[in-house]
Amino acid sequence: MKPAYFISDLHLSEKHPELTALLLRFLRSSAAGQARAIYILGDLFDFWVGDDEVSELNTSVAREIRKLSDKGVAVFFVRGNRDFLIGQDFCRQAGMTLLPDYSVLDLFGCKTLICHGDTLCTDDRAYQRFRKIVHRKRLQKLFLMLPLKWRTRLAAKIRRVSKMEKQVKPADIMDVNAAFTARQVRAFNAERLIHGHTHREHIHHENGFTRIVLGDWHNDYASILRVDGDGAVFVPLEKY
């Protein structure tokens, strides 16, 4: 059977065209074109201030994803902490299906829970409070009513503050909370969990389930997980 591919945390921006080039290379590969599905688990973009922002970056990415969709490859998207404002308009343009924060898939007989991963980092209480605020629908609606230029400036300011805070945060609170994560997996009756966000690429064999962490993309490295009937494995982009 055709494999499924999982990617996350590309953090695409005009400042890093090499990352966009990596993504386009993957999307144009024969492997992607022959996949049963591709799942993008958040932070595809480094920031997102609304579907009404039109740029060469956004347009080119949407165009290449749409080409895969038009070939019959199902493409799914889960919002991340950087691009949580991506809406149905952009997803329709790209031919992607927008998924909720948590979804359960039947992958080759293995019940698999997928999410971005930020909701699992419950020890970072300051972030969880911030997340709760910015995910309020009324606040998002008000933000999206602002002029695009204002939204861009606000997003840049928030990113600067977030970067400074991250430099002084203990590393352990920026990882998933093991007990909470295990409870979530059990609540969804899953055998496997796939998530991103922490940038700590690894396949963990936990008590009763497998937890697969997608890595971030940087320089000439792309973290791509292939899942098929034989299991799950990270495959270098060079093989595509």
From Swiss-Prot:
Q: How is the cofactor bound?
A: Binds 2 Mn(2+) ions per subunit in a binuclear metal center.
| Reactions mediated catalytically | UDP-2-N,3-O-bis[(3R)-3-hydroxytetradecanoyl]-alpha-D-glucosamine + H2O = 2-N,3-O-bis[(3R)-3-hydroxytetradecanoyl]-alpha-D-glucosaminyl 1-phosphate + UMP + 2 H(+)
Sequence positions that bind substrate: 81-82, 124, 162, 166, 169, 197
Please provide an example of a Pfam family that matches this protein in its UniProt record.
Answer: Metallophos
Q: What's a GO cellular component annotated to this UniProt protein?
A: extrinsic component of plasma membrane
UniProt main location, coarse: membrane
Topology relative to the membrane, per the entry?
A: Peripheral membrane protein
Q: Which domain of life is it from?
A: Bacteria
Q: Where in the cell is it found?
A: Cell inner membrane
- Cofactor(s) this protein requires: Mn(2+)
Q: What keywords would UniProt list here?
A: Cell inner membrane, Cell membrane, Hydrolase, Lipid A biosynthesis, Lipid biosynthesis, Lipid metabolism, Manganese, Membrane, Metal-binding
GO BP annotations of the record are:
lipid A biosynthetic process
Top-level class of the enzyme under EC nomenclature: hydrolase
Entries under InterPro entries matching the protein: Calcineurin-like_PHP_ApaH, LpxH-like, Metallo-depent_PP-like, UDP-diacylglucosamine_Hdrlase
What's a Gene Ontology MF term here? UDP-2,3-diacylglucosamine hydrolase activity
Pathway assignment reads: Glycolipid biosynthesis; lipid IV(A) biosynthesis; lipid IV(A) from (3R)-3-hydroxytetradecanoyl-[acyl-carrier-protein] and UDP-N-acetyl-alpha-D-glucosamine: step 4/6
The residues that hold Mn(2+) 1 are 9, 11, 43, 199
* Annotated Mn(2+) 2 binding sites: 43, 81, 116, 197
Q: EC number(s) in its UniProt entry?
A: 3.6.1.54
Is Lipid metabolism among the key words of this record? yes
Hey, which family's this protein in? Belongs to the LpxH family.
Query: What does the function comment of this entry state?
Result: Hydrolyzes the pyrophosphate bond of UDP-2,3-diacylglucosamine to yield 2,3-diacylglucosamine 1-phosphate (lipid X) and UMP by catalyzing the attack of water at the alpha-P atom. Involved in the biosynthesis of lipid A, a phosphorylated glycolipid that anchors the lipopolysaccharide to the outer membrane of the cell.
Q: What NCBIfam families does UniProt report for this protein, alphabetically?
A: lipid_A_lpxH, PRK05340.1
**What's the name of the protein?**
UDP-2,3-diacylglucosamine hydrolase
The species is Neisseria meningitidis serogroup A / serotype 4A (strain DSM 15465 / Z2491)
Gene name in the database record:
lpxH
